[in-house]
Design a protein with these regions (language model features):
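Start-transfer (signal-anchor) and selected internal transmembrane alpha helices
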Residues: 1-38, 220-231
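Extracytoplasmic catalytic/substrate-binding loops of multi-pass membrane glycan-assembly enzymes
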Residues: 41-60, 68-83, 90-91
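Transmembrane-helix motifs of polytopic, lipid-linked glycan transferases
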Residues: 102-121
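Short hydrophobic alpha-helices at membrane interfaces in multi-pass membrane enzymes
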Residues: 123-130, 164-186
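Aromatic- and kink-enriched transmembrane "portal" helix at the membrane-lumen/periplasm boundary
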Residues: 129-155, 186, 190
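Membrane-interface alpha helices of multi-pass inner-membrane proteins
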Residues: 176-193, 204, 231-236
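Transmembrane-embedded, aromatic-rich helix segments that form part
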Residues: 193-209
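Juxtamembrane membrane-water interface segments immediately following transmembrane helices
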Residues: 197, 218-253
Length: 253
């Protein structure tokens, strides 16, 4: 009887895994849905910029000063420097608008991909219902592109990705999965630091939740990886602030 019980428990994981959608199929579906959203928005709406974004774009593109300029307002210097360089190299491309659109649609793709990877096939009807409602709520941000909402979307996606990383035992695998969260948080911090800081408490809740799920976290590589994630996240924020302060350290500013 004990043997039969053991065999039954041991075979649960393969059955569950068999019900999962493959990563390739999840990637194909998420990209396909995002493409359909882009097509729908482009055919029915004309993307707009918020008032602050118009000013930021005009500074970055050189409309105000005659040459692309990285010293603008609110956004940190690391990000504005990259965008201003792109305007210098290819002035006929709307880089700022393209960047905000890439943030919105890129984060949508990542969230859809993660949803499809973590749910089994028999729950897809419920997931599609959630996705439909999600898209309706997100639609205004696809139409009117704003830097504040884009920073919030980046932070939310970073935390969502961090929360849904599987609790693997291998530290290198965990770090590879966390790299994307670092990148998203880094861009959010440089796009609008205040919004990124508002999202940090949610990351802390996820951090504590992950630790509470692991009974042996005090002596495991899992704890070290989680602490490394927190430390690197703080380094991202401090480094972005330090570079921005140095860029505006001249008496002229």
């Amino acid at each position: 009887m004990r043997y039969l019980t053991f065999e039954k428990i041991r075979t649960i994981d393969p059955i569950i895994d068999a019900q999962k959608i493959s990563r390739k199929k999840a990637a194909f579906l998420s990209v396909g849905i995002t493409f359909l959203v882009i097509l729908f928005v482009s055919l029915n709406y004309e993307p707009l910029l918020g008032p602050d974004d118009v000013g930021i774009r005009n500074i970055l593109s050189g409309i105000y000063t005659g040459t692309p300029e990285a010293h603008t307002y609110f956004m940190y210097y690391i990000l504005t420097k990259v965008i201003s360089i792109l305007y210098k190299w290819f002035p006929n491309i709307y880089w700022y608008v393209l960047f905000l659109a890439l943030v919105n649609y890129g984060c949508l793709t990542l969230i859809l991909y993660r949803f499809l990877c973590i749910v089994d096939r028999y729950k897809l009807i419920g997931i599609w219902s959630v996705v439909a409602g999600f898209l309706i709520l997100w639609l205004p941000f696809f139409i009117t592109l704003e830097w504040t909402s884009a920073a919030g979307i980046l932070s939310a996606t970073a935390i969502f990705w961090y929360a849904t990383v599987p609790d693997r035992k291998d530290r290198n695998e965990l770090l590879r999965d966390y790299i994307l969260s670092f990148i998203l948080l880094f861009i959010s911090c440089n796009l609008r630091n205040d919004v990124a800081l508002l999202a940090i408490p949610f990351a802390g809740v996820v951090f504590l939740w992950k630790l509470s799920r692991n009974k042996s976290f005090f002596s495991s590589a899992f704890l070290h990886t989680q602490l490394l994630f927190v430390i690197l996240s703080m380094v991202i924020i401090v480094m972005s602030r330090a570079v921005d302060s140095f860029a505006y350290s001249s008496d002229v500013w």
